[in-house]
Amino acid sequence: MFISSSLIFTQNKKSSIGVALYRFDDNYIKYLKSYIEKNIGNKASLTILDSHNSQITQNDQIEIFLNRKVNLIAINLVNESYAQTIINKVSVRNIPIIFFNREPDLEALNSYNNVWYIGGSSENAGTAQGRVIADSWKSHANWDKNEDGKIQCIIIKGRTNSVESENRTQYMKDYLKKNNIKLNILAEVYAFDNRKTASIEMDKLMAKYSQKIEYIIASDDNMALGALDSIKKLGFNNDSRMLNYIPIVGIGGTPEYLEEIKNYSVFATVMQNPSTQAEVLSKVSLNIINNKSPLDGTTLSFENNKYIFVPYIPVTMFNLDRAIEIYK
């Protein structure tokens, strides 16, 4: 039953799981939360808290879980750099931790036996994004506006202290370099995972580079949509024939972004299936609280004894229907 807009509680005396989500109003997280609830069902007591995109709030929520003596804490970090701080606090109680969806570094995970990560790999995300950019560049010769063989691009990244965002961008660049595709980066800016901020930053860049930009590459769909908001005001990406068009490529696969692919407003994204991520998280969590091996009864495997990676899949108009079906 619902206690408040940011708290869900399901009664079960046998075992308990506390989940902290970085923000409920993120479209992808909204579906992830729903799938977690569905997979856990009545198999455990489940408390899900909304961290409202505040690491301070999330830290307080960890204290709530500790005071309630939950059997496992699952955390979608607001800020990956706080993973070690959380591990230090929780490990004293010897409570298992699963980080998910936002990837902490291996050094932090190796500091405690009972901590793991489930979700995407920033390497996989960036590589998949690089692949979809490379494939589209090779198949659309007309997108090379100045015919110099280089991609004139804007790169939009998340928070300045986000290792995941930086890694996504770097692995994208690495893939393109390995495939002999050169980038001419007109600007590389931070938009803090925020659509409005991305739109404001893009407004400034369009004033300077509007006729030069050949790609907009964002490390998150939300920021990619912010870029779209900006360029649409100047008449770009408003035509299904893809005239006066700047290809935009994001990461995430949110329902709203997929709708814009359908409208020919953005070109592509790479996504994880939230149902798959929630299913893996739920199976591993239930195994742990029932004193089983984390991977018991699954075909899953660990990387570096700590990571269970859920792959990213490129999404364009060609496989869009399959991606949309995930959210139904």
Question: What does each of the following model-derived ranges do?
Answer:
Residues 15, 150, 155-160, 279-328:
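Hinge/cleft segment of the Venus flytrap/periplasmic-binding protein
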